[in-house]
Amino acid sequence: MNMFIVMMINIILSMSLIIIAFWLPQLNLYTEKANPYECGFDPMSSARLPFSMKFFLVAITFLLFDLEIALLLPLPWAIQIPNIKITMLTAFILVTVLALGLAYEWMQKGLEWTE
């Protein structure tokens, strides 16, 4: 019963936040919000400059390996559970998939800046 109340509160809170997030932007629609802020001066050039795709690939790779660290950090505590084989197999599969993805990106020359 107590778990049901907690789940209902979480669902109601989540749904109310989603509804508010969709409802608030529709209150004040005008074009000034869509333009970049330029401190009152006319923009010298376009404010939306394209960015390097190589930088994007390196940033995504960094995020993936940062996520790997976050997932593997509690591994010493997870080893203390009785069924250690499943925990170690899951960690090994995660590291293997990420290593294969890194090797593929390296083979495709996605990590090289000179081209």
Curated annotation (Swiss-Prot):
GO terms for biological process: mitochondrial electron transport, NADH to ubiquinone. The chain crosses the membrane at residues 4-24, 55-75, 86-106. It is found in: Mitochondrion inner membrane. Its main location: mitochondrion. It is a multi-pass membrane protein. Core subunit of respiratory chain NADH dehydrogenase (Complex I) which is composed of 45 different subunits. Interacts with TMEM186. Interacts with TMEM242. This is NADH-ubiquinone oxidoreductase chain 3.
